[in-house]
Amino acid sequence: MEKLTILLLVAAVLMSTQALIQHDGEKSQKAKMKFLTARTLSAKTRGVDCVGLSSYCGPWNNPPCCSWYTCDYYCKF
């Protein structure tokens, strides 16, 4: 009976961990889509290839781009 309880506890912890990892992946995907949308709109209105990313860099929004190298990578996406 103790082994069953331990196995159920381990399974619950693993399922919780998987749910957290999946949520973080969805969050970063949404941030990337926001970035790509902003970049596209900026390019259409200003005739440039890349939107400035200072507003996207910060721990509050899990940005896809916080360095110019990464910015260049996403802008050439």
Curated annotation (Swiss-Prot):
<keyword id="KW-0732">Signal</keyword>
<feature type="propeptide">
    <location>
        <begin position="20"/>
        <end position="46"/>
    </location>
</feature>
<feature type="disulfide bond">
    <location>
        <begin position="50"/>
        <end position="66"/>
    </location>
</feature>
<dbReference type="GO" id="GO:0005576">
    <property type="term" value="C:extracellular region"/>
</dbReference>
<feature type="disulfide bond">
    <location>
        <begin position="57"/>
        <end position="71"/>
    </location>
</feature>
<dbReference type="Pfam" id="PF02950">
    <property type="entry name" value="Conotoxin"/>
</dbReference>
<keyword id="KW-0960">Knottin</keyword>
<dbReference type="InterPro" id="IPR004214">
    <property type="entry name" value="Conotoxin"/>
</dbReference>
<feature type="disulfide bond">
    <location>
        <begin position="65"/>
        <end position="75"/>
    </location>
</feature>
<keyword id="KW-1015">Disulfide bond</keyword>
<keyword id="KW-0964">Secreted</keyword>
<dbReference type="GO" id="GO:0008200">
    <property type="term" value="F:ion channel inhibitor activity"/>
</dbReference>
<comment type="similarity">
    <text>Belongs to the conotoxin O2 superfamily.</text>
</comment>
<keyword id="KW-0800">Toxin</keyword>
<feature type="signal peptide">
    <location>
        <begin position="1"/>
        <end position="19"/>
    </location>
</feature>
<dbReference type="GO" id="GO:0090729">
    <property type="term" value="F:toxin activity"/>
</dbReference>
<protein>
    <recommendedName>
        <fullName>Conotoxin VnMEKL-0111</fullName>
    </recommendedName>
</protein>
<keyword id="KW-0528">Neurotoxin</keyword>
